[in-house]
Amino acid sequence: LGNNGHIGFNEPGAAFEKETHCVDLTESTIQANKRFFEKVEDVPTQAYTMGIKNIMQARKVLLIVSGEGKAEILDKVLYGPVNPQVPASILQLHNDLTVVADEAAMSVIKANHR
């Protein structure tokens, strides 16, 4: 789960009907992945990703979320409206979704949905 609600490299605004495809990475995704490379110029600017349609066709989906920085978006993903601007929100409609989240990632949900 990305800070903006993306899953895979399906960024906000991605069509829910998309299948596996090549995407141009957003600057925020490039910055988030630069820690894996010697310099930011080495980070790929494109990637292949499963489309949201493919993800929703999976028998089971496991969403792992950690850190306080993901708390607000996790609340939107699980309790907000299903919306292409929060791509992972479509997972609310999956028949077999398991979410594994640490205490920090759950903090907003615990505060808002007791």
Q: What are the language-model segments listed below?
A:
Residues 1-114:
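Conserved phosphate- and dinucleotide-binding cores of soluble alpha/beta proteins
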